């Protein structure tokens, strides 16, 4: 069997910016002294006149990005998720969101898969924070292909967009020739009638593995990739809930306020069914190898399978 291709979505982000930069001279990239880590360094090398290093000053970077957006250019502000959504929340809210400016935020190193950097850098609250900002699109790709498509879609979208990218290399799963990406539109990756698994980011691949394991036992799970947390594809979520009668959400984020929260809010009003939220259960992360942490917090295929079995 050939080895599955893996690539970190932060690398996909950097590569996508370079390709977009070749086509659009109004694209400007900002970073906060993290060009190597966020992979925006390759854009800096290709287009030095359109790259701004703001130093370790994320709040200022968001203000600068907002100012650039008022000139008609399309700024992509890049830093770790903890600093983009956490440290600079006020500036994102007031300088970007409130005036509805066309700023794109590329937040890398999200979730516990940041690994050894530990709890202070493992942002598991960013979806929740960004969802509360009116008009903000919030998205998280599952692989290289989706990440590149998401960056291009973010450029085309008029308005603020928050995208979370990962440090850990993840399998390419969206290599279907019929694959089409659109912000706000989920993708059914596997059909099933017994329950629905809704996942995003690096949790999509292990959710598919868990579904395959369940199928061996006669349980057919529909698997949906909801890459856009806001706006949520409510039509798809409601239809799946009505069809299967049970829903499980899986995310590398707190179970409070993220994908699970968005799905529960939707279903509570439009299709009440039992829901199990799998994610970071109201705790902080810790320092350790990314793969080991995903296993400890139940976000690997075995952990997801075990929690679904207990639920059904």
Predicted features, each with a name:
Residues 1-164, 169, ...:
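Thiamine diphosphate
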């Amino acid at each position: 069997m050939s080895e599955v291709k893996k690539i970190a979505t932060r690398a996909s982000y950097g590569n996508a910016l370079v390709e977009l930069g070749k086509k659009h001279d109004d694209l400007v990239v900002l970073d906060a002294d993290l060009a190597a880590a966020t992979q925006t360094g390759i854009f800096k090398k290709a287009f030095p006149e359109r790259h701004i290093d703001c130093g370790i000053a994320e709040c200022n970077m968001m203000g600068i990005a907002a100012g650039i957006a008022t000139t008609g250019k399309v700024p992509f502000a890049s830093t770790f998720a903890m600093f983009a959504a956490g440290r600079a929340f006020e500036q994102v809210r007031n300088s970007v969101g409130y005036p509805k400016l066309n700023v794109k935020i590329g937040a890398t190193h999200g979730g516990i898969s940041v690994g050894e950097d530990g709890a202070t850098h493992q942002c598991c609250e960013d979806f929740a924070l960004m969802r509360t900002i009116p008009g903000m699109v919030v998205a998280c790709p599952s692989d290289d292909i989706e990440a590149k498509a998401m960056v291009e879609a973010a450029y085309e979208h008029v308005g603020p967009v928050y995208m979370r990218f990962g440090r850990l290399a993840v399998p390419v799963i969206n290599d279907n020739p019929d694959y089409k990406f659109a912000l706000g539109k989920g993708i059914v990756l596997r059909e099933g009638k017994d329950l629905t698994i809704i996942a995003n980011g690096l949790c999509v691949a292990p959710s598919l593995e868990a579904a395959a394991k369940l199928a061996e036992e006669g349980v057919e799970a529909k698997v949906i990739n909801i890459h856009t947390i806001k706006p949520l594809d409510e039509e798809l979520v409601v239809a799946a809930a009505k069809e299967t009668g049970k829903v499980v959400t899986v995310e590398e984020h707190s179970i409070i306020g993220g994908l699970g929260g968005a799905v529960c809010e939707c279903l509570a009003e439009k299709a009440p069914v039992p829901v199990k939220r799998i994610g970071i259960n109201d705790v902080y992360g810790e320092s350790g190898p990314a793969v080991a942490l995903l296993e400890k917090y139940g976000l690997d295929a075995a952990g997801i399978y075990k929690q679904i079995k207990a639920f059904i």
